[in-house]
Amino acid sequence: MIKICLAGFGKMNHAVYEAALQNADVKVVSILEPTPQKIEGVEMFTEPQKAFALADVIIDFSTKEACVENMCIAASMGKNFVIGTTGINEEGLKKIKTATASSSVSGVLSGNFSVGVNVFIETARYLHERLPDYEIEMVEVHHNQKKDAPSGTALRTLAALGKTKEEIPVHALRMGD
C-alpha cells in the first residue's frame, strides 16, 4: 500500500482524498494544512517534517510559496512527490530541482492534470504557429476560491505561445464556486 501525504487541502487535494478512499492500494495517512481539520483516520499537521514522515509520497496542491519549501523538505527526507501547485517561478523550480538532484527521489510536476487542458494548449500553439498575424486575447474563468490570477494554466498557455501576460491581454475572472 502506498501511503500518501496531502500538502494543502483545497479542492484538488479533497478530490485526491476522495479518490484514495476508493482505492485499496493507496491510503492518505497525513495532511499538511495551516488550519488543520478533523478527518477520521488521517493525521493533520502544520509542520511538513511531521506530516511527511508518515508517507511514501507527497502530493502538493498548496501555494507556490509553500510548495517550494515543502518539496525541498520532502527531497531531503527521501520522499517522492507530485506537484500540482501552479505559479511556481523559475527560482522556485530551480530550488526544487537542486533538492531533488541531491537526493534519490523522483518527482512529477504538472500545473494541470486535465487531458482536455493539455490538448487545448497544444492546439493553441498549433494555431498560433499557423496564424501568426491573428490577435490574441485570453479570458479565463475559475471559481471564486481560485487563488492565482491569472492561473498557472493561463500562464502555461501563454508560455506555449512564446508570449507573456504583458504582450497578450489576460482577463482572469473569479466567480461562483
Model-derived features with residue positions:
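Short, ordered loop/turn segments at secondary-structure junctions
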Residues: 34, 86-88, 112-114, 141-143
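Hydrophobic beta-strand scaffold residues
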Residues: 28, 44, 81-82, 106-107
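Short catalytic-loop micro-motif centered on adjacent basic/acidic residues
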Residues: 5, 58-60, 81-84, 108-110
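Beta-loop-alpha module in the N-terminal Rossmann-like domain of NAD(P)-dependent dehydrogenases
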Residues: 56-76, 87-92
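P-loop/Walker A phosphate-binding loop and immediately adjacent motor/lid segment at beta-alpha junctions
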Residues: 7, 11-16, 70-80, 85
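Rossmann-fold NAD(P)-binding glycine/threonine-rich loop
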Residues: 72, 85-107, 118, 123-127
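C-terminal substrate-binding/catalytic lobe of Rossmann-fold NAD(P)-dependent oxidoreductases
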Residues: 3-7, 11-49, 131-177
